[in-house]
Swiss-Prot record:
It comes from Drosophila melanogaster (Fruit fly). This is Small ribosomal subunit protein uS10. Belongs to the universal ribosomal protein uS10 family. Expressed ubiquitously in embryos, highest expression is in the midgut. It holds the Pfam family Ribosomal_S10. One of its GO terms (biological process) is translation. The modification Phosphoserine is found at S16, S18. The keyword Repeat does not apply.
Length: 120
C-alpha cells in the first residue's frame, strides 16, 4: 500500500507585509555614544513589538601606529605610540522594512556609523 504524495499549499504572503531579517551594524570610537544608540534602537523596536536579537558585541579593533619623535633622526631614539579603538555592535530585527525606517529615524549621536542590511 503506497501512499500518494499530497500537494501542500503554502499561504502566499504579500510582498508589502513580508517579514525581512534586518541586520543593523553600529561602529564607533566612543563606547558611551554607541551604547546609547543601541539602547534607543532596541527600545524603539520593542515598542513596535518586533523580535530583536542583540546587541552582539563584536571584538574591539585596536589600530596602532608607532613613530619616532624626532624628524631628523638624531638624538636618543624615543618613540610615540598612538592607538585608536573601534567598537562594533550588531542588532538583528525581524520585521517589515517600513517599520525599520521608523525605528532608524531616531537621533544618532555624532561619531556613530550605522549600516543597515536587509535579507530575506
Amino acid at each position: 500500500m503506497a501512499a500518494a504524495p499530497k500537494d501542500i499549499e503554502k499561504p502566499h504572503v504579500g510582498d508589502s507585509a513580508s517579514v525581512h531579517r534586518i541586520r543593523i551594524t553600529l561602529t564607533s570610537r566612543n563606547v558611551r555614544s554607541l551604547e546609547n544608540v543601541c539602547r534607543d534602537l532596541i527600545n524603539g523596536a520593542k515598542n513596535q513589538n518586533l523580535r530583536v536579537k542583540g546587541p552582539v558585541r563584536m571584538p574591539t579593533k585596536t589600530l596602532r601606529i608607532t613613530t619616532r619623535k624626532t624628524p631628523c633622526g638624531e638624538g636618543s631614539k624615543t618613540w610615540d605610540r598612538f592607538q585608536m579603538r573601534i567598537h562594533k555592535r550588531i542588532i538583528d530585527l525581524h520585521s517589515p522594512s517600513e517599520i525599520v525606517k521608523k525605528i532608524t529615524s531616531i537621533n544618532i549621536e555624532p561619531g556613530v556609523e550605522v549600516e543597515v542590511t536587509i535579507a530575506n
